């Protein structure tokens, strides 16, 4: 499948001129196809840059929201991590880009019986499944928020994942791994698509 090269984050920051408090604490940036973007800070605050108005706005977030983010392929949902928790938070997105209705939705597995391992980055595929870098490996969640598979690695916890086309690349313990999948990545800068429902089962 064809791969769209992601926008340069440094170019975006220089062009959009975020508030100083945001620029100095950026954790995750989700560039969108129209030049807008969601940006999280290390404290879990979420900001939205509107490419039409050139305005930065701080978004509503629930208590204890974390800095990791991913956007659903239809661009109608934004998912974030939750601090010291195995939950992920799902927000609805209004047409103007603002967030509302935040609630716990995805739940990750954890064999350590504590929540001291921070959730890593995450990305969706075109089927609406969410891939999350965790201490146990890459946890794959379905549309209903349930973990359906865990890809574990011999080197242990996953530090970061990269999903490009039909290949997933994994950084773990100073080593890099790759695996070809029977699905395709959908990153934030890709055009939104309709996703077939997996049902309630």
Regions found by a protein language model. Give the residues of each.
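Short loop/turn segments immediately following the C-termini of beta-strands
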Residues: 41-43, 82-83, 93, 135, ...
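Anionic-ligand binding region
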Residues: 84-112, 117
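WD40 beta-propeller blade core
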Residues: 47-48, 89, 139-140, 177
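Short coil turn/linker residues within repeat-based beta-strand modules
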Residues: 1, 53-55, 85, 95, ...
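A conserved acidic, glycine/proline-rich C-terminal tail/linker
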Residues: 135-159
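Beta-rich, blade/repeat-based domains predominating
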Residues: 9-43, 61-77, 108-133, 155-166, ...
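Beta-propeller fold detector
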Residues: 2-8, 57-61, 99-107, 149-153, ...
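Short loop/turn segments immediately following beta-strands, especially the blade-tip
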Residues: 91-98, 180-188
């Amino acid at each position: 499948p064809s791969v769209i090269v992601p926008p340069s984050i440094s170019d975006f920051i220089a062009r959009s001129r975020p508030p100083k408090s945001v620029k100095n604490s950026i954790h995750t940036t989700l560039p969108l196809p129209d030049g807008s973007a969601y940006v999280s800070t290390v404290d879990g605050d979420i900001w939205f840059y509107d490419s039409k108005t050139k305005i930065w706005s701080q978004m509503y977030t629930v208590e204890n929201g974390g800095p990791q983010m991913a956007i659903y392929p239809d661009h109608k949902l934004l998912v974030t991590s939750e601090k010291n928790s195995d939950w992920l938070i799902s927000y609805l997105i209004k047409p103007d880009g603002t967030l509302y209705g935040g609630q716990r939705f995805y739940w990750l597995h954890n064999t350590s019986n504590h929540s001291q391992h921070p959730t890593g980055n995450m990305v969706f595929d075109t089927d609406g499944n969410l891939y999350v870098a965790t201490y146990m490996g890459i946890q794959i969640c379905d549309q209903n928020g349930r973990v359906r598979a865990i890809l574990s690695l011999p080197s242990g916890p996953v530090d970061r994942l990269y999903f490009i086309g039909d290949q997933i690349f994994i950084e773990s313990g100073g080593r890099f791994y790759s695996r070809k999948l029977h699905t395709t990545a959908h990153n934030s800068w890709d055009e939104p698509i309709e996703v077939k429902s997996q049902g309630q089962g």
